[in-house]
């Protein structure tokens, strides 16, 4: 019999197969749709502001609503993965994004747009956390850094595609068509995820849901590691689990603050620039197409950077 605990080790040591790269591709496409969904409002901000007569402050609230939802989704939705599994969480998160984008396309008051942006953000937050774990689990040690960079690059690609859709659709069908297109694309991909997305190997071996062993062997077979994999003895309680307060202990406080500050600064600058650049350039005298194109170039640069740094890592 094969030791189940060595399955992850076997994946780490083995070459990446087509099935594993398909999982990386699905994670990248989920991140691509996130980029489309998150920045759709930035690319349509001028048209929305004109239709509802919004002030800059009101527009700022709308641009922040999706980011608030992302933060809430990452903090409160993503932890459900440890209880229900990565696959159900990701399916639920993609469904939330689909509903949020669809609702945004049919609003009659701008306050409702803020509500639907929060719903979209909740889904995006759950997706961002879950896809990172799935990508890491199914990647070999040799290709993990590159696989994660491919997944991360999806966000920028989605933003670029979002800009292209915004330019093509807004002039012909109005800003609502951009959100409708995002909802349709996200909904269609949800169906593909339901068919092909596997469960986390760690979740199957530690939580051991119904038919876990059968599902584990099916995954192993698709990877090309077909054997009689057995589940390890289930551990009911982890006594050594450390509380989150340990991050703020004297030993870790300095590192915690440095990491949090750096990450906050990066995310703040990225989303501030990405969200406001098209609208500000439009006010400065550029056409809608020109302002959106500049926003697309920012995302394109991020995509290239993610791939280059992934290869260097």
Q: What are the residue ranges of the model-derived segments?
A:
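Glycine-rich segments within core transmembrane alpha-helices of 12-TM secondary carriers
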Residues: 145-171, 185-186
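Central mid-sequence intracellular linker of multi-pass
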Residues: 175-237, 247
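Extracellular/periplasmic helix-loop-helix junction of adjacent transmembrane segments
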Residues: 31, 42-72
């Amino acid at each position: 019999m094969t030791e189940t605990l060595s399955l992850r080790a076997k994946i780490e040591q083995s070459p990446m197969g087509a099935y594993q790269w398909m999982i990386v591709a699905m994670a990248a496409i989920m991140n691509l749709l996130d980029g489309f969904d998150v920045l759709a409002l930035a690319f349509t901000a001028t048209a929305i502001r004109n239709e509802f007569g919004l002030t800059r402050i009101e527009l700022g609230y709308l641009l922040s609503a999706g980011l608030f939802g992302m933060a809430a989704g990452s903090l409160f939705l993503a932890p459900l993965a440890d209880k229900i599994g990565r696959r159900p969480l990701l399916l639920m998160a993609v469904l939330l994004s689909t509903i949020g984008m669809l609702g945004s396309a049919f609003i009659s008051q701008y306050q409702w747009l803020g509500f639907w942006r929060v719903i979209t953000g909740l889904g995006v937050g759950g997706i961002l956390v879950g896809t990172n774990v799935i990508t890491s689990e199914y990647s070999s040690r040799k290709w993990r850094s590159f696989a994660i960079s491919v997944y991360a690059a999806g966000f920028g690609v989605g933003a670029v595609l979002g800009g292209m859709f915004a330019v093509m659709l807004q002039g012909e069908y109005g800003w609502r068509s951009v959100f409708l297109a995002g909802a349709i694309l996200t909904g269609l991909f949800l169906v593909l995820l339901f068919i092909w997305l596997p469960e986390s190997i760690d979740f199957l071996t530690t939580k051991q849901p119904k038919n876990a062993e059968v599902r584990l062997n099916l995954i192993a077979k698709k990877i090309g590691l077909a054997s009689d994999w057995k589940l390890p003895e289930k551990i009911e309680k982890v006594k050594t689990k450390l509380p989150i307060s340990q991050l703020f202990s004297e030993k870790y406080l300095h590192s915690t603050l440095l990491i949090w500050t750096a990450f906050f600064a990066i995310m703040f600058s990225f989303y501030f620039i990405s969200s406001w650049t098209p609208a500000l350039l439009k006010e400065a005298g550029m056409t809608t197409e020109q302002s959106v194109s500049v926003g697309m170039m920012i995302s394109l640069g991020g995509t290239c950077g993610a791939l280059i740094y992934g290869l260097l890592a």
